[in-house]
Amino acid sequence: MGFDIHLIANFGALALITLAGPAVIFILFYRRGAL
């Protein structure tokens, strides 16, 4: 049971990083007025 929770937590963190990476880059460019 603990292993499943740990696996889900790792998958969630990986998905969060995958989604947050492009989002952070987009926000940085947006605040600079590049878009």
UniProtKB/Swiss-Prot annotation:
One Pfam family of this chain: PSII_Ycf12
Superkingdom assignment: Bacteria
Keyword Repeat included in the entry's annotation: no
Predominant cellular place of this UniProt entry's protein: membrane
Cystine connections: none
Record flagged with keyword Metal-binding: no
TM segment ranges: 7-27
Membrane topology designation: Single-pass membrane protein
GO biological processes: photosynthesis
Keywords carried by this UniProt record: Membrane, Photosynthesis, Photosystem II, Thylakoid, Transmembrane, Transmembrane helix
Cellular localisation: Cellular thylakoid membrane
Coiled-coil segments: none
Assembly description: PSII is composed of 1 copy each of membrane proteins PsbA, PsbB, PsbC, PsbD, PsbE, PsbF, PsbH, PsbI, PsbJ, PsbK, PsbL, PsbM, PsbT, PsbX, PsbY, PsbZ, Psb30/Ycf12, peripheral proteins PsbO, CyanoQ (PsbQ), PsbU, PsbV and a large number of cofactors. It forms dimeric complexes.
NCBIfam families per UniProt: PRK13686.1
Family note: Belongs to the Psb30/Ycf12 family.
Name the UniProt record assigns to this protein: Photosystem II reaction center protein Psb30
